[in-house]
Amino acid sequence: MATIDKHSYAHMFGPTIGDRVRLGDTDLWLEVEKDFTEYGEEVKFGGGKVIRDGMGQSQASCFDTPDLVITNVVILDHWGIIKADIGIKDGRIAIIGKAGNPDVQDNIDIEIGPGTEIIAGEGQIVTAGGIDAHIHFICPQQIDEALMSGVTTMIGGGTGPATGSNATTCTPGPWNTHKMLQATNDFPMNFGFLGKGNTSLPIALEEQIEAGVCGLKLHEDWGTTPASIDNCLSVAERYDVQIAIHTDTLNESGFVEDTLGAFKGRTIHTYHTEGAGGGHSPDIIRACGESNVLPSSTNPTRPYTINTIDEHLDMLMVCHHLDPAIPEDIAFADSRIRKESIAAEDIMHDLGAISMIASDSQAMGRVGEMITRTWQTAHKMKQQRGPLAPDTERNDNFRLKRYVAKYTINPAISHGISHEVGSIEIGKLADLVLWKPAFFGIKPAMIIKSGFIAAAPMGDANASIPTPQPVYYRPMFGAHGQAPANTSMTFMSQASLDAGVPDKIGLTRMVSACKNTRNIGKDDMIHNSWQPTIEVDAQTYEVRANGELLTCEPVTTLPLAQLYCLF
């Protein structure tokens, strides 16, 4: 068999087993664990290349071949880091393995035919589309920002720049819910809306769930009392939807112990569990040790830098309608911003005690930076804490799996949508993000919705080739016409689907019911299920996990930052 040198092979077909890839300008290194392609039998498209009639392409009917194959790509997901070809059929991942023509090649899993499109994945990394589970739907322009960053699913609440939506992730009531469902029908993004959960009687919650929300949100600005918590969770248990909560910063209606008691062991997603984004001061972070709590962070505290504290005070005053002329409002803001718990938050992410990261879009968070902030946190922790067992100095594979799970599979599990999205697995929607390694985590090379390209960097449309400047992110055909509705999904309660809500309000897009939200717990958070005993010193705000002080220094510089954002 003819061979080529390793450098030439990597340049032509991408890395293989044992090869390492640096992610962006971080200190994080990926190492390929398994390669499904076969040396000498790789498929590649182009003039004089393999995927031609009678060579790498068969004569098979379109019914028997994929609509799209991504060739020779490195998959980074919670379950592994492998190199493979990915076959996509009818908008879903059909098979992961070796592509080619079984007429002339052995051991072919994916048959390429005349009806198959090709995306060259050589030298690139593919991840599942990001899931941002803390969205304030304040303006529709957020959707483009999120999509271009690699997010393909947005879960949250809001009705636009209403005062309530600026502060709380709630879409209150059936009328507002229907309007938001209709408004988002034609966007190339998956959606799930959270209704307002703050009430002590069931009827208004039942109406919202039956109207089409995928869950409910309890927010302190609407009054997160023990009675409303108990009532909201009781309704959720009957309807199989998730509850998200922003707890009582001022401890007016109870302390963290009262809130944890009101949960009564029932599953709940705690937003910004460190507390800077809101929650019992100073010790809401204790919730990370509870088996029924699914904790997440929002990205403004990710990671802890020299600017984190200062910018939070200004953000808080605006987002929560506070008045700097009122001393009590200033005290409220000061009570939420604690450097000790923000430092501990970094370490708790690295140890898997906080399971998810989201944005808190335009309400103390940046919708286009969820993925970037996640990898910046991973980089900072490697710099400050070294390899994360069982990793060695050679690669960071386990750390990468832990962190990618925080914005893909774990929010999908938490909100009952992991049967449709959240990972690169057979049968799920082909919501995929391609990255060139040098731009990993900040500038995607392509965003694919259900197997169809929705967004990508693109050059001058009047140029003779696709690459001349100015190159910037633009919507592709998957973002136009009827394509978004046929490649994107809205997640709703089963009760609303049973009631025929999509047809009644004229939705034309795909819909799916969220499910299995009430029989899960922290143990189900992949690579992020640690449940330590958390203690917070009420005077110093120091955080300890199982007796060990959790602290780290803020950093002065970060990767995936100005170097990539000059224009």
Curated annotation (Swiss-Prot):
Give an example GO cellular component term for this record.
cytoplasm
Show the catalytic activity.
urea + 2 H2O + H(+) = hydrogencarbonate + 2 NH4(+)
Active site located where?
Answer: H320
Specify which residues bind Ni(2+) 2 according to the UniProt entry for this protein: K217, H246, H272
Q: Which CDD domains match?
A: Urease_alpha
Q: Which Pfam families match?
A: Amidohydro_1, Urease_alpha
Checking PANTHER family in the record gives: UREASE
Q: Which InterPro entries match?
A: Amidohydro-rel, Metal-dep_hydrolase_composite, Metal_Hydrolase, Urease_alpha_N_dom, Urease_alpha_subunit, Urease_AS, Urease_asu, Urease_asu_c
Tell me its EC number(s), please.
3.5.1.5
PROSITE patterns linked: UREASE_1 (PS01120), UREASE_2 (PS00145), UREASE_3 (PS51368)
| Description of how the protein assembles with itself and partners | Heterotrimer of UreA (gamma), UreB (beta) and UreC (alpha) subunits. Three heterotrimers associate to form the active enzyme.
Protein name per the record? Urease subunit alpha
Q: Among the record's GO biological process terms, what is one?
A: urea catabolic process
- Residue numbers binding Ni(2+) 1: H134, H136, K217, D360
The protein's enzyme class: hydrolase
Please indicate which superkingdom the organism of origin belongs to: Bacteria
Cofactor(s) demanded: Ni cation
- Belongs to which family? Belongs to the metallo-dependent hydrolases superfamily. Urease alpha subunit family.
Q: Tell me how the cofactor is bound.
A: Binds 2 nickel ions per subunit.
Q: Does the keyword Coiled coil apply?
A: no
**Residues noted as binding substrate in the record, renumbered to the chain:** H219
Q: Which organism is it from?
A: Alteromonas mediterranea (strain DSM 17117 / CIP 110805 / LMG 28347 / Deep ecotype)
